[in-house]
Amino acid sequence: MKYQLLLAVMLLLSGCSAPPKEEVKKKETPSVSFVAVGDNLYHQCMLDEAKTSSGYDFTGYYKNIKKYIQADYCFVNQETILGGGTPSGYPLFNAPDSVAGDLEKVGFNIVNGATNHAYDQGAAGILHSIQVFNKYPRMTYLGLYKNEEEKLNIKIVEKNGIKIAFVSFNQYVNGMTYQKKLPYMINFHESTMMENMKKARENADIVIVSCHWGIEYDYYPNTFQKNMAKQLADAGADVIIGTHTHTLQDVEYIQRADGKRTLVAYSLGNFVSGMLEESCQLEGMLSFDIEKKKIKNVVFTPLVNYYTLTG
């Protein structure tokens, strides 16, 4: 009797067993990864160290950080112009042409050129730098322009169906006298910047703004930076990447006019430089993921620009 009952239960269970469930695959949301660092600033001691028998090789400066800066898009502020002619350090910087290729080898593909040292080698230096970076089609060079038409042409990149627009703004350069003669070469004017912001917002999913601003060696953003950040946010900026001060400054979210938030890094400090001050050796890396209309997984990573003096 017990055997029959057990058999009946077994038959009942086997007869009522549910069909195997089909595995439901969760649809992945398309996204791209983004990493940003601060000033790539080659002083004379660094030029001397990178000199080889056949030219220059700067890749060694990045060997300890390279694996951490790999992303779909990797931003760096190229502080010194690739002006052609003899390379030089402070005060009139001039980086060799090989810098562009070395940055690409390391992993950088978004490069800001609008800095206070952009005019160190004059208008010819700006044009030469543009020409050099244009030889690398996988790289996007921001902030310097050959003519007015190019200045108003928004740089947009696309990956995984996500369009990212870049707008670049520079507060000033060393040697301001050229502005009236060649105003299109660098974007100083708020009116032009707002016009570019409007175009960027209309034609892209995400807008990232590079701002070379503030006061050197300050630890906190000043009134100009705060006001400009708010203006850019209200114009639709999703992320603002600040450079120039050579020091770390605040990273925060600010409210936009449309109710969304803008991620602002007022200054990421130096990335690579020959500066001796401790405050100029502390720096940061900002990383995040980009979805169609969203910035997520934001991480700030502190870095140290470490080097040893050999001479």
Model-based region annotation:
Residues L13-G15:
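C-terminal motif of bacterial Sec signal peptides marking the signal peptidase cleavage site
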Residues A8-L11, K66-K67:
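Short linear sequence elements within intrinsically disordered, low-complexity coil regions
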Residues S17-G311:
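Acidic, metal/ion-coordinating pockets
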Residues K2-A8:
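Sec-dependent signal peptide recognition
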